[in-house]
């Protein structure tokens, strides 16, 4: 059976056909509409899936935000242009006339990355550092989603009580500091208004402020990982996302994590499936996991 997998992120929408063998084909992308209106996202999703839906027997969605009863509830609306709520499953069933499931994107990616691990691993945490910071937790070989879909939203744990206000309403969240949006928001002077990609480029060219912003993000993530180790005693942490997979970033996180006491050290791995983990995880869950 072929799954039409969809990944909804703060920057882009992706879709692909994934067979029972896990092979990805006909992958497509569109920019995520920066709009508060549900119609904008519906129209973008329609354009994304219309060339693919005739070749699939079901739909699996991995989306940013809390997924509850098939709907997207934005924990940080800024990541979706201010959109607060969207009926994901209902919309895709109407667009495709196919059975549809939905799950948080980082939870889906965690499940895909867990399948790729070697050895006897039952406890792992996945962290995505991208437009926002999200996560997924596998414990006892099972993916944790929680009764309300909130499990794994580790980007909204406290990093700095005097830090910036996060889009979720809290102050000093990891996401407000370490994410691509957080990196860009802290830029000043000639870097003011630059996006995270530009800041990484400037850091590679030796720009001191850009380097400091990236170090601030990596240091914040390392402290989060130490907290995660203390909370879950996980065997490894897998890092993905456009920031998490940026050249040199994971090495910086490892450097800062090494400065923590030894009890909080844990193996860090780059995401095996890179930017396709959410698509694959959603398809895998559609094949047999009860959500």
From Swiss-Prot:
Which Pfam families does the entry mention? Answer: ROK
Q: Which SUPFAM superfamilies match?
A: Actin-like ATPase domain
Source organism per entry reads: Escherichia coli O139:H28 (strain E24377A / ETEC)
UniProt keyword list? ATP-binding, Carbohydrate metabolism, Kinase, Metal-binding, Nucleotide-binding, Transferase, Zinc
Give the protein's biological function: Catalyzes the phosphorylation of N-acetylmannosamine (ManNAc) to ManNAc-6-P.
Please list every transmembrane segment annotated in the UniProt record, as residue ranges: none
User: Which residues does the record give as ATP binding sites?
Assistant: 5-12, 132-139
Q: Give the multimer and partner information.
A: Homodimer.
Its protein name is N-acetylmannosamine kinase
Q: Which GO molecular function terms does the record list?
A: ATP binding; N-acylmannosamine kinase activity; zinc ion binding
Coiled-coil annotated spans = none
Disulfide bond entries? none
Name the Enzyme Commission number(s) assigned to this protein: 2.7.1.60
Query: Which residues are involved in binding Zn(2+)?
Result: 156, 166, 168, 173
Catalytic reaction annotation:
an N-acyl-D-mannosamine + ATP = an N-acyl-D-mannosamine 6-phosphate + ADP + H(+)
The family note in this entry says: Belongs to the ROK (NagC/XylR) family. NanK subfamily.
């Amino acid at each position: 059976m072929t799954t039409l997998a969809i990944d909804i992120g703060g920057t882009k929408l992706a879709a692909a056909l994934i067979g029972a063998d896990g092979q990805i084909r006909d992958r497509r992308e569109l920019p995520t509409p920066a709009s508060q209106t549900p119609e904008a996202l519906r129209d973008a999703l329609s354009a994304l899936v219309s060339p693919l839906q005739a070749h699939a027997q079901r739909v699996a969605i991995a989306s940013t935000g809390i997924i509850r009863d098939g709907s997207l509830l934005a924990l940080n609306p800024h990541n979706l242009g201010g959109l607060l709520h969207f009926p994901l499953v209902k919309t895709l069933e109407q667009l495709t006339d196919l059975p549809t499931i939905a799950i948080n994107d980082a939870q889906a990616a965690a499940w895909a990355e867990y399948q790729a691990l070697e050895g006897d691993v039952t406890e792992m945490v996945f962290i995505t550092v991208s437009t926002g910071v999200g996560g997924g937790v596998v414990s006892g070989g099972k993916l944790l989603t929680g009764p309300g879909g909130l499990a794994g939203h580790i980007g909204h744990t406290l990093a700095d009580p005097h830090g910036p206000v996060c889009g979720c309403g809290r102050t000093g969240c990891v996401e407000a500091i370490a994410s691509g949006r957080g990196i860009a928001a802290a830029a000043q002077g000639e870097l003011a208004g630059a996006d995270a990609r530009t800041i990484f480029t400037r850091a590679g060219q030796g720009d001191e402020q850009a380097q400091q912003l990236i170090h601030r993000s990596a240091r914040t993530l390392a402290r989060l990982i130490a907290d995660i180790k203390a909370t879950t005693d996980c065997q490894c942490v897998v890092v993905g996302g456009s920031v998490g997979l940026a050249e040199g970033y994971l090495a910086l996180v490892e450097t800062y994590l090494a400065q923590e006491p030894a009890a909080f050290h844990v193996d860090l791995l780059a995401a095996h499936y890179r930017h396709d983990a959410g698509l694959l995880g959603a398809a895998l869950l559609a094949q047999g996991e009860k959500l």
